[in-house]
């Protein structure tokens, strides 16, 4: 069984929550709960409210996601 492709979409950080989780408002108006990917955590990239980010969302659960990139 093949793994489903994840959806990549851009959004803006609305709120910083505990445990490196963030509330992200996506381009389409949806708000998702997203955690930071391992590479971003490994390189100590700071993510603050107001930052524009790229989020990966699973097609199975569109309420949760993973932050994969922070735009400069």
UniProtKB/Swiss-Prot annotation:
Annotated Gene3D superfamilies: Nucleic acid-binding proteins (2.40.50.140)
PROSITE patterns registered for this protein in UniProt: S1_IF1_TYPE
Cysteines joined through disulfide linkages: none
Annotated keywords: Cytoplasm, Initiation factor, Protein biosynthesis, RNA-binding, rRNA-binding
A cellular component term, taken from the record's GO annotations: cytosol
Tree of life domain: Bacteria
Main function: One of the essential components for the initiation of protein synthesis. Stabilizes the binding of IF-2 and IF-3 on the 30S subunit to which N-formylmethionyl-tRNA(fMet) subsequently binds. Helps modulate mRNA selection, yielding the 30S pre-initiation complex (PIC). Upon addition of the 50S ribosomal subunit IF-1, IF-2 and IF-3 are released leaving the mature 70S translation initiation complex.
Family that this chain belongs to: Belongs to the IF-1 family.
The name this protein goes by in its record: Translation initiation factor IF-1
Encoding gene, per UniProt annotation: infA
């Amino acid at each position: 069984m093949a793994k489903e492709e994840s959806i990549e979409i851009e959004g803006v950080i609305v709120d910083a929550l505990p445990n490196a989780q963030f509330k992200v408002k996506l381009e389409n108006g949806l708000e998702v709960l997203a955690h930071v990917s391992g590479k971003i955590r490994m390189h100590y990239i700071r993510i603050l409210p107001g930052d524009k980010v790229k989020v990966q969302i699973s097609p199975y659960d569109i309420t949760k996601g993973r932050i994969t990139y922070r735009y400069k």
